[in-house]
């Protein structure tokens, strides 16, 4: 799991601002297929948005915690139903500022 400093999180939030959600969770919740899609998107993009729809606060937080745990990605930000995740790939596309 990647730990990010406040400076790095602010940098990633700025990059993520213009992104659209790549993965959207529906009524079925967090399935193996959704996790595989998130993994694929993280490998390809490093920084993604995931939309967690139609859940109450506690359920949404449990889903977010499960996604972060399973993907070993860093949770950059959560606003409403949108989760921003970051995980560096082998060939880093995003150069983070120093801690």
UniProtKB/Swiss-Prot annotation:
<dbReference type="InterPro" id="IPR035920">
    <property type="entry name" value="YhbY-like_sf"/>
</dbReference>
<protein>
    <recommendedName>
        <fullName>RNA-binding protein HI_1333</fullName>
    </recommendedName>
</protein>
<dbReference type="InterPro" id="IPR001890">
    <property type="entry name" value="RNA-binding_CRM"/>
</dbReference>
<dbReference type="InterPro" id="IPR017924">
    <property type="entry name" value="RNA-binding_YhbY"/>
</dbReference>
<dbReference type="GO" id="GO:0003723">
    <property type="term" value="F:RNA binding"/>
</dbReference>
<dbReference type="InterPro" id="IPR051925">
    <property type="entry name" value="RNA-binding_domain"/>
</dbReference>
<keyword id="KW-0694">RNA-binding</keyword>
<feature type="domain" description="CRM">
    <location>
        <begin position="2"/>
        <end position="98"/>
    </location>
</feature>
<dbReference type="Pfam" id="PF01985">
    <property type="entry name" value="CRS1_YhbY"/>
</dbReference>
């Amino acid at each position: 799991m990647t730990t990010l400093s406040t400076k790095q999180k602010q940098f990633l939030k700025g990059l993520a601002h213009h992104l659209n959600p790549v993965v959207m969770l529906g009524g079925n919740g967090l399935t193996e297929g959704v996790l595989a899609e998130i993994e694929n998107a993280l490998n390809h993009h490093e920084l993604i948005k995931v939309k967690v729809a139609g859940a109450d606060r506690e359920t949404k937080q449990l889903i977010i915690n499960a996604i972060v745990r399973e993907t070993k990605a860093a949770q950059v930000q959560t606003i409403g139903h949108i989760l921003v995740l970051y995980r560096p790939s082998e060939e880093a596309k995003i150069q983070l500022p120093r801690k």
